[in-house]
Amino acid sequence: MNIFRLTGDLSHLAAIIILLLKIWKSRSCAGISGKSQLLFALVFTTRYLDLFTSFISLYNTSMKLIYIACSYATVYLIYMKFKATYDGNHDTFRVEFLIVPVGGLSFLVNHDFSPLEILWTFSIYLESVAILPQLFMISKTGEAETITTHYLFFLGLYRALYLVNWIWRYYFEGFFDLIAVVAGVVQTVLYCDFFYLYVTKVLKGKKLSLPA
């Protein structure tokens, strides 16, 4: 495992922990898109079904279990534990416009036409756009809490580091996964505007807002 993969995983884990702590400590999920979190839970569920069929390493298995457990814990906090604080009026992105095309694409473009491979491909495509409901929600409300922006920053950093990881693996291992790379580029591009606002506003102590 190279340093970019490791730091990418740690950034991803940091984002998840920041979000869970934000919700738990504030006893509120205000400003958090439940729809994005449901999509991420679906991403991890469909991606890590190989937990039942293969073992790569203790690290790999542990991270998969952590991602799945944390994603469902987040969904539970939003839709059950702190349901009264969930801002459903602004979390209105039509997720079917993401799931249906992604589902169709995963059947058409994949590495192998087998159930696990199609589901893995579906998860890769879906993850690339799963943050859209959250960004859409921020654009509707006009701003985001600082802690929420930190969550988004580490989530975007994770994907950017994974892009570097794939470049590293291509040059030093000869490994190249076109599906993962293209989806990763799409996901990183979606964060570009946010990264700019994060650096120019949040790091200077200002509130973040996205153009409506």
UniProtKB/Swiss-Prot annotation:
Region annotation Interaction with the K-D-E-L motif on target proteins: where it falls in the sequence: 47-48, 159-169
Keyword set, alphabetical order: Cytoplasmic vesicle, Endoplasmic reticulum, ER-Golgi transport, Golgi apparatus, Membrane, Protein transport, Receptor, Transmembrane, Transmembrane helix, Transport
Site (Interaction with the K-D-E-L motif on target proteins) location in chain: R5, S54, E117
Region (Important for recycling of cargo proteins with the sequence motif K-D-E-L from the Golgi to the endoplasmic reticulum): 204-207
Effect of E127 to A/Q: Loss of binding to the sequence motif K-D-E-L
Compartment list: Endoplasmic reticulum membrane; Golgi apparatus membrane; Cytoplasmic vesicle, COPI-coated vesicle membrane
MF term (GO), any: KDEL sequence binding
Bilayer topology: Multi-pass membrane protein
Pfam (any one): ER_lumen_recept
Record topology, Lumenal segments: 1-4, 53-58, 111-116, 169-178
Family: Belongs to the ERD2 family.
Role summary: Membrane receptor that binds the K-D-E-L sequence motif in the C-terminal part of endoplasmic reticulum resident proteins and maintains their localization in that compartment by participating to their vesicle-mediated recycling back from the Golgi. Binding is pH dependent, and is optimal at pH 5-5.4.
Domain commentary: Binds the C-terminal sequence motif K-D-E-L in a hydrophilic cavity between the transmembrane domains. This triggers a conformation change that exposes a Lys-rich patch on the cytosolic surface of the protein. This patch mediates recycling from the Golgi to the endoplasmic reticulum, probably via COPI vesicles.
PANTHER family the UniProt entry points to: ER LUMEN PROTEIN RETAINING RECEPTOR
Protein name: ER lumen protein-retaining receptor 2
The encoding gene: KDELR2
